């Protein structure tokens, strides 16, 4: 599974999400299995999603999960424990590490940003 430009378009075309994240300026690491992506956000808009090739490059914080976990989270109607980042965190389905201050300060923004990759059908 790779993160696609489609996800970036969904995020950047969601005016409510952009308004909510207008003060977010950072890069965070999003992991799927053994692959990490650096997601750069400028004023709430995703500027780039790049595969991390050097382990010395990292984001302010990192969210990591297995491919099956993200696939379940991104269903139109996710099953119990996969519907929300914190539910997934509580069940140890995902890992969240690093400086969590900007994540918590902009919690709804990041939850909606990640959920915006949901499919339109199951």
Where are these regions (language model features)?
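Feature captures hydrophobic
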Residues: 1-122
């Amino acid at each position: 599974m790779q993160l696609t430009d489609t996800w970036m378009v969904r995020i950047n075309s969601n005016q409510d999400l952009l308004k909510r994240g207008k003060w977010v300026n950072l890069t965070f690491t999003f992991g799927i299995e053994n692959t990490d992506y650096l997601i750069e956000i400028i004023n709430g808009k995703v500027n780039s999603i790049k595969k991390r090739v050097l382990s010395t490059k990292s984001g302010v914080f990192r969210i990591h999960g297995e491919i099956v976990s993200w696939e379940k989270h991104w269903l139109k109607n996710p099953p119990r424990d996969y519907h929300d980042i914190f539910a997934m965190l509580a069940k140890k389905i995902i890992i969240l590490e690093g400086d969590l201050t900007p994540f918590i300060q902009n919690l709804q923004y990041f939850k909606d940003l990640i959920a915006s990759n949901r499919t339109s059908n199951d």
